[in-house]
Curated annotation (Swiss-Prot):
This is 7-cyano-7-deazaguanine synthase. InterPro entries: QueC (IPR018317), Rossmann-like_a/b/a_fold (IPR014729). It comes from Bacteroides fragilis (strain ATCC 25285 / DSM 2151 / CCUG 4856 / JCM 11019 / LMG 10263 / NCTC 9343 / Onslow / VPI 2553 / EN-2). It holds the Pfam family QueC. It catalyses: 7-carboxy-7-deazaguanine + NH4(+) + ATP = 7-cyano-7-deazaguanine + ADP + phosphate + H2O + H(+). GO terms for molecular function: ATP binding; ligase activity, forming carbon-nitrogen bonds; zinc ion binding. Binds 1 zinc ion per subunit. Its EC number is 6.3.4.20. Pathway: Purine metabolism; 7-cyano-7-deazaguanine biosynthesis. ATP binds at F10, S11, G12, G13, Q14, D15, S16, T17, T18, C19, L20.
Amino acid sequence: MKNDSAVVLFSGGQDSTTCLFWAKKHFKKVYALSFLYGQKHAHEVELARGIAERAGVEFHVMDTSFIGSLGSNSLTDTSISMDEDKPKDSFPNTFVPGRNLFFLSIAAVFAREQGAFHLVTGVSQTDYSGYPDCRDSFIKSLNVTLNLAMDEQFVIHTPLMWIDKAETWALADELGVFDLVRNETLTCYNGIPADGCGHCPACKLRKQGLEEYLSKRNR
């Protein structure tokens, strides 16, 4: 790929860890960029740091705590009980308004300073949680906007956009990091590593995908 450096938006969860190792396969130089946005499960950043060190990639953290104060959501506000299932006619209250918009915009500025013009994010439209900023149309639109804003040629890569959680597990296995992703990542909204709490939306999706993948792999 033209320009051999990439910045991975990295939370230390299943999706972004899979993307980190995908990026290592495709780029010579990889930066992992994490964000503190007021999330209740903020220790994910320290787990992310450890994974980045194991992967041998440069790790950075951005303080974006203002994001949590902009909109009401259950990931940053301890007074709000988390939706365990997606409401029929609205976003789940785990949606953090503007999160991916801010993360990708900040990542682009950071990347430009490193001379990197590839951004990698683990958003997916297939196992859709109802988050508008995970849609392919949003990513493509923002890619154009970032290029216009900085007169550069960024490329936003979304390796997981059109695959489901079972296929994401398969990709981790293909990349040789299945056990690392299963045992050392933090996907749980309640901040419990590996298999997590088992009942938040993120854990349910992760478990469902894992069981589906293992049932196919073990045939």
